[in-house]
């Protein structure tokens, strides 16, 4: 029954997107105004970092982000999923990380769910994200960020990374089972 409901959500999502007459790309502008996400003249999502450098986000990036959000937070509340999506965008905007979504996600040891360039969940590659994961990614692109610009997160109960446990943290937020933070 859950599989049927999931398939119905995915089919609905993929049925609605083309009807919006979108050319596969969206726009997000950080700041006081959010641009129309469905303006058909837009060629990519422009996510701006502090130095006004743009990070362009394609449909493939949105799918990849949704896969990671699902694999890292499938048992978390909506705000936890949004927080994971926000960390990906925050890293792309911050110094010291790759400047693209795929670069951030595929950076070595960045996300425990990424193995050999594939997003893995419970040992199975090619994760298919659920609609809640897509919603979280799109909300993050609209500027929602419950982490207040965190670039790291971990689950203290299951984490095997001593670095995550020992590092001096700033801006700590606990959302669901994860701890989100910046490094001091």
Predicted feature residues:
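Bacterial extracytoplasmic/cell-wall-associated proteins, especially those involved in peptidoglycan
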Residues: 43-184
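N-terminal secretory targeting signals
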Residues: 1-59, 176, 180-184
